[in-house]
């Protein structure tokens, strides 16, 4: 995981909401099919908490389809704010993740704070498990009876659960 930058921007000219964009640069290994999870955390002397991301401006994380939008279905939800993606579209490239969140920088102006980016390289099994949970909790079509509920992935024979693992790389920057 490379450099991390912070950019503050207003969501539009008529809205007072400020968005913080944290950009995190990483390089994907071209010789393997890789699966990732990314988390953004806010850290100061009083708290260490996972933040929800606004995924509209990050193609690797935006799972909402035009059909979902047209019918007013909810946004795709990520279990535990663990935003998962694979390397199919970025294989072997250096990529900049655009992690947008509602601004905490103006609230933290009295404290030194940092955004911490945790990039996890996860096993295919862990990715499938998280994806199945995300798909199940984000399936608005099943909620209204128009689609079948998807089962949760398990690789345990004769039981439930998953045997999987991950490797983490973290970088933080104080602001």
What annotation goes with each model-predicted range?
Residues 1-175:
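A sequence/structural signal for flexible, mid-protein segments enriched
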């Amino acid at each position: 995981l490379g450099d991390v930058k912070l950019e503050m921007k207003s969501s539009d000219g008529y809205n007072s909401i400020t968005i913080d964009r944290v950009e995190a640069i990483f390089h994907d290994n071209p010789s393997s099919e890789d699966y990732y999870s990314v988390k953004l955390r806010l850290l100061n002397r009083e708290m260490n908490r996972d933040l929800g991301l606004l995924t509209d401006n990050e193609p690797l994380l935006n799972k909402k389809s035009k059909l979902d939008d047209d019918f007013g279905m909810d946004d795709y939800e990520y279990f535990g704010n663990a935003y998962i993606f694979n390397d199919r579209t970025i294989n072997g490239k250096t990529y900049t993740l655009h992690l947008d969140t509602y601004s905490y920088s103006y609230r933290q102006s009295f404290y030194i704070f940092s955004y911490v980016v945790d990039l996890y390289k996860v096993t295919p099994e862990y990715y499938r498990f998280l994806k199945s949970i995300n798909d199940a909790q984000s399936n608005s079509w099943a909620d209204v009876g128009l689609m079948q509920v998807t089962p949760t992935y398990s690789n345990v024979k004769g039981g439930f659960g998953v045997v999987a693992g991950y490797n983490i790389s973290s970088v933080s920057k104080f602001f």
